[in-house]
Amino acid sequence: MTANPTSTASTGSAHPPMTHLPAQKHGAIQQLFDGVWFVRGVAKLPMLVPVKITRSMTIVRGVDGLVLFNSMRLTEAGLAELDALGEVTHVVRLAGFHGRDDGFYRERYGAQILAIEGQAYVRGLGKPGPSYLEPDAWLTADSPLPIADASLRVIG
């Protein structure tokens, strides 16, 4: 399933359409192990003084497709590399401020978003606000995961 990367058109799902941030500079997808890949990139933060931070996304072959950890929006060339690996079926958000691109993968691929219970998708630091995205499922230490023989340890 593909969609216009900045589309706000309905995906036909129960989730409201979103406007997505553009892809930023990143490297090639690198295979680390059989069924495990990694890609590094950067993010420019919209602050008074411009700040760049490094980002990374891990891709794991799961039970029924690819699982993305700490999603990072890829360029069209990067998405072609990702598509060559298989179908994206799940996105896992492990920590706060690591999910800004989760909605992009939900809209483009119909991926199910999983997030650690108690997290919120909010913009900005230190100022609670409305959630801009809701996961399809909240994860706890006892939740089933989309990777065979995987387990989750929740810290905090």
Report residues per predicted region.
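Conserved beta-strand hairpin/beta-sheet module of binuclear metal-dependent hydrolase folds
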Residues: 27-77
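Residues that flank catalytic or metal-binding motifs in active/ligand-binding sites
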Residues: 56, 109, 148
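Short active-site-adjacent helix-start/loop capping segments
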Residues: 47-48, 68, 76-79, 99-103, ...
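Metallo-beta-lactamase
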Residues: 117-156
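Active-site metal-binding motif and surrounding structural segment of the metallo-beta-lactamase
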Residues: 73-116
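Short, flexible loop segments at the rims of nucleotide/cofactor-binding pockets, characterized by
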Residues: 14-17, 45-49, 67-72, 90-93, ...
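Conserved beta-strand scaffold positions in the cores of enzyme catalytic domains, especially
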Residues: 36-38, 91, 113, 152
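Long, non-catalytic terminal segments
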Residues: 1-45
